[in-house]
């Protein structure tokens, strides 16, 4: 048995919420934008709806708008404050292709980059690269390799 004379009783319990409170306050004061590359996955929709409800981050979902909204409705998730971007209809798509070709330094053609950017993992990565978002979360349906390969 250990001697008790050197022990202090801690009466305060620190919760995870307490630990993250300063970070949450900082994010609310200066919200960052996160891109979710799998915009119709129920796990992603749940996370996005929670972040939006808490006002912690601005949310961009990549995917077909109708499919994302239908999946959210089916799961009971409110993503009405999220921006949904469909690579097939993105106004800055040509600029994105041009930037990717330059970044790849001739290793891929414009046609190859166009095909890659229609995949949400590549598209989301380029949104971050081009300053349209601050960070990206993927991997719900993509493998780890497919999630990091575009970087």
Protein language model regions, located:
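Glycine/threonine-rich beta-strand-loop-alpha-helix active-site module
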Residues: 140-151
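Contiguous, glycine/small-aliphatic-enriched amphipathic segments in soluble metabolic enzymes
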Residues: 4-138
